UniProtKB/Swiss-Prot annotation:
UniProt KW Transcription keyword: yes
NCBIfam families: nusB
Annotated protein name in UniProt: Transcription antitermination protein NusB
Annotated PANTHER family: ANTITERMINATION NUSB DOMAIN-CONTAINING PROTEIN (PTHR11078:SF3), N UTILIZATION SUBSTANCE PROTEIN B-RELATED (PTHR11078)
Single GO MF descriptor: RNA binding
Disulphide-bonded residues: none
Spans through the membrane: none
Organism listed in the record: Mycolicibacterium gilvum (strain PYR-GCK) (Mycobacterium gilvum (strain PYR-GCK))
Function text: Involved in transcription antitermination. Required for transcription of ribosomal RNA (rRNA) genes. Binds specifically to the boxA antiterminator sequence of the ribosomal RNA (rrn) operons.
Gene Ontology biological-process annotations: DNA-templated transcription termination; transcription antitermination
Length: 164
């Protein structure tokens, strides 16, 4: 039987990652910068700030590192919408979920989608869970090919940087 407390910990970490992405977008900085600042405050003894869950930091850095690809993939699967027109919370939820679909090999795809839908229920509009589910359902159709292509590039002897 799965460790339900661990599942809850990951859920909270995802929710916090969505919060960081939302804050970062509002402030015009990256989610990784927000995460680093939060952890620096916690490390310096700020009483009211706890260190972030390591998974939250991993997600924030991952979304920051792969932002252009994640946004392109989301945009390609929006029907009748543009990324800029989406509510900011929905953008953050989708970015976390797409990062998990592409890069979190220990997270089954249905779990990433279910978690995103649950976060949309908790944090966004009544229409958002169905919308998020629909977009991620389409993204899930192409993630195996994207993961395979990324693995092939990493395995290629030519994938390293050239040295002078």
């Amino acid at each position: 039987m799965p460790d339900r407390k661990g599942d809850r910990g990951r859920h909270q970490a995802r929710k916090r990652a969505v919060d960081l992405l939302f804050e970062a977008e509002a402030r015009g900085i990256t989610a990784a910068e927000v995460a680093e600042a939060r952890n620096a405050l916690a490390d310096n003894g700020a009483d009211d700030i706890a260190p972030l869950n390591p998974y939250t930091v991993t997600v924030a850095r991952g979304v920051t590192d792969h932002a252009a690809h994640i946004d392109d993939l989301i945009s390609a699967h929006l029907q009748g919408w543009t990324l800029d027109r989406l509510p900011a919370v929905d953008r953050a939820v989708l970015r976390v979920a797409v990062w998990e679909l592409l890069h979190a090999v220990d997270v089954p795809e249905p779990v990433a989608v279910d978690e995103a839908v649950e976060l949309a229920k908790q944090l966004s509009t009544d229409d958002s869970p169905g919308f998020v589910n629909g977009v991620l359902g389409q993204v899930m159709l192409v993630t195996p090919q994207i993961r395979a292509a990324a693995a092939a590039v990493q395995a290629s002897p030519d994938s390293g940087s050239a040295t002078p």
